[in-house]
Structure formats: C-alpha cells, structure tokens
Amino acid sequence: MKQIPMTIRGAEQLKQELDFLKNTRRPEIINAIAEAREHGDLKENAEYHAAREQQGFCEGRIQEIEGKLANSQIIDVTKIPNNGKVIFGATILLLNIDTEEEVSYQIVGDDEANIKAGLISVNSPIARGLIGKEVDDVVVIQTPGGKVEFEILEVEYK
C-alpha cells in the first residue's frame, strides 16, 4: 500500500476520532444493542437493527482510520528548511490576478482538506499546479470553474 502524506495536525485529528470511536461510541452502541435485545424478538426490533447498523459503520470507520494511520507518512513542515518552494504542508499566499483578491491555502493530505478553512488536498488541481513553484511565480491553474491565474506572494512552512 502506498504512503499517505499527512500533517502532524491531521494525524492528531484522526487519532482523536479513533479514540472517540473506540472509547466512547463503541461502548454506547454495545449498550444500545444490549438494551434492544432485552425488548424481545430481534426480527422485528427496529432499535436492534439500527444499533447493529451503527455498529457496522463505527467498526468500518475504525478500520479505515487505523489503515490510514498505519500507512501515513507524517510530515512536520516546520523541520524542513524553507527554500521558498511550494511543498506538501506549505502555507501559500496567492494573488488571484483576475480579481486582485488574496487567498491563503495550506497543502494538506486528502483527509485534512477543508476549503473553507483554507486547507487544500495535495491532490487538488490548485495544489498540483503550485507544487514546486516559488515566490513571484505566476501559475495558471485549471479549476472546475475555468482557468485561474495566481501569483505566489509568500510561502511559509508553519
């Protein structure tokens, strides 16, 4: 299996979710199943079937997170010397040349991506267009809305 790049923050978020699922959610579901069993006939017991379905989702998510963490390559960008190039984990300040609007993005792993928080996936069109570029470079990126031209104003490793 290939390594999944992930920031330290992303790995911590997954570990917290895993801890919640294993130590809080799993026991809640087990209790709900036990309680539903006490109501008698399991064939027509909607509470029992709903709890079993929740258990399946919970166990599936636990396995998914454990797999991602086992195959993750956790990258601490603060320990990488800043040579001004856009790399995984870098925070980039961009100027949209058409609108004169400044936007800031951090390139993160797929699971961490949240465009509203300025976190873009390393596999997104914007990130793929920026990787390897430097401050003052102008890049044209093909987005779902058409071509967008950005100037790289700043690259930080934080």
UniProtKB/Swiss-Prot annotation:
GO terms (BP aspect): DNA-templated transcription elongation; regulation of DNA-templated transcription elongation
InterPro entries the UniProt entry points to: GreA/GreB_C_sf (IPR036953), TF_GreA/GreB_CS (IPR018151), Tscrpt_elong_fac_GreA (IPR006359), Tscrpt_elong_fac_GreA/B (IPR028624), Tscrpt_elong_fac_GreA/B_C (IPR001437), Tscrpt_elong_fac_GreA/B_fam (IPR023459), Tscrpt_elong_fac_GreA/B_N (IPR022691), Tscrpt_elong_fac_GreA/B_N_sf (IPR036805)
Keywords attached to this entry: DNA-binding, Transcription, Transcription regulation
Keyword Transcription carried by entry: yes
Coiled coil: none
Disulfide bonds: none
Record bears the keyword Transcription regulation: yes
PROSITE patterns cross-referenced by the UniProt entry: GREAB_1, GREAB_2
One of the Pfam families matching this protein, by short name: GreA_GreB
One of the record's GO molecular function terms: RNA polymerase binding
Organism domain of life: Bacteria
Family the entry assigns: Belongs to the GreA/GreB family.
HAMAP family, per database record: GreA_GreB (MF_00105)
PANTHER family, alphabetized: TRANSCRIPTION ELONGATION FACTOR GREA
Role according to the record: Necessary for efficient RNA polymerase transcription elongation past template-encoded arresting sites. The arresting sites in DNA have the property of trapping a certain fraction of elongating RNA polymerases that pass through, resulting in locked ternary complexes. Cleavage of the nascent transcript by cleavage factors such as GreA or GreB allows the resumption of elongation from the new 3'terminus. GreA releases sequences of 2 to 3 nucleotides.
NCBIfam families: greA, PRK00226.1-2, PRK00226.1-4, PRK00226.1-5
Protein name according to UniProt: Transcription elongation factor GreA
Organism phylogeny: Bacteria, Pseudomonadati, Pseudomonadota, Gammaproteobacteria, Pasteurellales
Designated gene of the protein: greA
